[in-house]
Amino acid sequence: MENDKMEIYESLIRWLSELNLSAPHGTVQELSDGAALAQALNQIAPEVFTDSWLSKIKSDVGANWRLKVSNLRKIIEGIYVYYQDELSLNLSEELRPDALKIAEKGDPHELGRLLQLILGCAVNCLEKQKYITQIMELEESLQRNIMAALQDIEYIWQGASPSRNSINTAATSLDVKTLQEDRDTLAQKCHETNKKMLGLIEEKAALQQEIVKLQAIVGRYENPNLIGDDGTSLGPIQLGSSRYNDLRKLVDSLKDELLQAETARDDLKMKSMIQEKEIGELQVKIDELHAATAEIAQLKDEIDILKEANEKLKICETQLQTYKKKLEDYNDLKKQIKLQEERSADYLKQNLEYEEEAKKYAGLKGQVELYKKKIQDLHGMLDEEMGKTVRAEFEYNQLQGQLAVVQREKETLLSERDTLREALDELKCGQAVGADGVGHGGPGGNTMSKELHSNDVCERIERLERENKALREGQGGQTALSQLLDDANQRNEKLREQLKSANQKILLLSQHHAEDGTTKSELEMQMKQTLELGEQRSSAQQQLDETTQHQLSNLHTKIANLEAALVVKDQELQAADVRYKKCVEKAKEVIKTLDAHAISEALLMDKVDSASGTGVDATLTTVGNGGTAARAPMGQQEEQLIATAFYRLGMVCHREAVDARLLSGPGQSFLARQRQPAARKPLNANYAKK
């Protein structure tokens, strides 16, 4: 069995060589790349296996089995598509050749199955007669193997189920099934007749061979020089001889066999004629079946056309219904247009009335603008005066602090002056007592309480006492006492002059403190000089300079920071004023657009603003106390206006929502609701735009 299959596959390879292919195709390995098979398919059915399809098959693959597998899979897939589309046959996947085995191992069994499929394509293509004649011109052994391969393919076809498009009606499906069964039975009969014809051809060839053999035997016996089996010459044939009798018997037997062969031949001729008639009848039936299949295809096309017409009819019906709905909506729109025309006429009348009112109020616009400008100027003046008052208050507070410091220093100086006077009086008293009892002088003469003197006075008194003692011890007498008294008097006069100058400077500083700030430091230094009486001026001056420089640097930094903060605050105030003015203008516009009655409210508001503007001069006199109160009434008025505008806007939105709910009621269709006009805006908006 395997040998027969191998012979069939070799015969198919030899048949493939008759197609004049350019690619090598002599062995299984040469065919395993798929290039020759693709060229054969392109030559057999160029309308399906086109040149573009052939270009996808790679020819130079070498030993790359992956490219071979890719080529073979493309070929097998194309063959299956050809059988399905062109021949209306669905081949099972079990019969699919294994491309991997062909490419990797060169399996002849799988390659033979692929060649069988290619042979089926050649026998059933448009030029099938050409390929059938090529097969008939081959050798008898090749013809037998190719016929056997065709029989296997026919068995495969009989097992395959044809792929047909589904037919809706039951009658047409039954006709198609019966026609397919008739076609299968006729194909089976044709196959059987072909097998019988092949058998008769083989018998004819065998008979011809036997006739040749018999003719050779007759020629040998007719030879007179024929030698028998025993080596003796049989001699010429004569009547009555044994040789003649043997030959006569042989001739009679051969005649009988010839008659039998002729009768068998006549029987076979009769059978062949009958089979030819049957073949003709079957061919006629096949033609009728082809015509019936064509009619069925036409019927299917008509059914498809009717389906499309039915779908179009449904679409037209739906469109007709939509058009009816649109017509109803159009009628509704006509009614709505009439209502809108009536409303527009009313609106025109109202617009005329509003225009007349606008002409009346046009004269008041100039006054309103003037009042606005005046109000803005007054606001600017008010801001400037407020800034001045703030600065004046700041300077006033600073001056009060400085004045309090100076007063405290003055009080301390006055108290020190009083103490010095008391000390001077006590010294005078002590000197008078010393003059009365000089011999009794000593520490007991100093009966004054030291608690009544300051530290400096005590030190001076002690120093003066020591000097008095020294003078009394050194010189003695009234002369030393008189000199000391004169010195003390001179010092007292100097101290009094210094006190007078210090008091005068304090008064001058209190009067001109705002103009000259540097005199304070000088006064403090002089006061310290008078109080300390020559204490270490250099060290005190250095320390004072360091502290003043440090304080000045701190003050400069604080001033710079305050100036920067002041600039930022000014910018913020300007931006707030701009936003404030914008909000006021927007509130006025909203009130004007909301209702016609807002015009009178705006006029009242302007009157209130003007009245408040006239009162600004009165409030400017009391800037320090009521600077912020001038702006408070206007802010309250504007807040009230913004609140009224907000409530009116809420009423309008509520009205629009109610109109939308009424328009989208259940009594109207969807399209009618979509075509409803939007809720009208208030008429005063149009007036405001004009």
UniProtKB/Swiss-Prot annotation:
Residues 134-515, 546-577 form a coiled coil. The lineage of its organism: Eukaryota, Metazoa, Ecdysozoa, Arthropoda, Hexapoda. Residues 6-122 form the Calponin-homology (CH) domain. The coiled coil domain mediates homodimerization. This is Protein hook. One of its GO terms (molecular function) is dynein light intermediate chain binding. Belongs to the hook family. It comes from Anopheles gambiae. Involved in endocytic trafficking. Probably acts as a cytoskeletal linker protein that tethers endosome vesicles to the cytoskeleton. One of its GO terms (biological process) is cytoskeleton-dependent intracellular transport. The keyword Magnesium does not apply.
